[in-house]
């Protein structure tokens, strides 16, 4: 049975009159990809800052690998590698200089640093610009170094705050290939915030925040079943035939779409009208639809 590597219980944090985190409780299993979703201001960054020891909580408990962060902050911090949304690299320094100075804080120097650097160069493919100043790197190159910096000390948990925002598709895919490899080879836990719902759809568990509280949680499959309808697309039939089903429908290119509560209802409809459903597909709603149904907002923050 998988153990909980992060456990947050009844966490609260306010800024003056604003309740940023409101009685928040959730768990993250060791080795899983955990997605933490919410619009800007929902409480994600505050929670992450408390988890990383950068911000004091008002009340509640935060445990990393069974250890309370209040009681052994230095020990729990070493278990975490963090990639912040805004890069914390020193732009005038080269990539190697940035990583060397960071590694020294963990006591990784000399041959140990050289060995770890070479491992990260191979994993993240940055040998070509190892000696280039960070200020001269592209956004995608800089993001790779942000991740390398977070991985220097072999953390058990990698926290990724919007890791692929603004990156080209090729770099996004490279980063996710690395993350998936680390999960498989090192059983690394990944704590993700993202605006890309296709990334959240691959998570083992999802928590959706709204105004500092959990609005919904579960696996992507559970959330899609609970909050959004399936859609049946049917092709090659006339409008009179679609009307004969006595259901609401929408005209689309080359056919029609019908919303159903779930796959069971879709199957029943198709079996009962096999003569009409000779060319069709059943599609579950996506995580974008889940987020909109739960919060009334798009992840970009629009109502």
Model-predicted regions and their roles:
Residues 60-68, 75-76:
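Conserved ABC transporter NBD signature motif
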Residues 154:
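Conserved catalytic motifs of ABC-family nucleotide-binding domains
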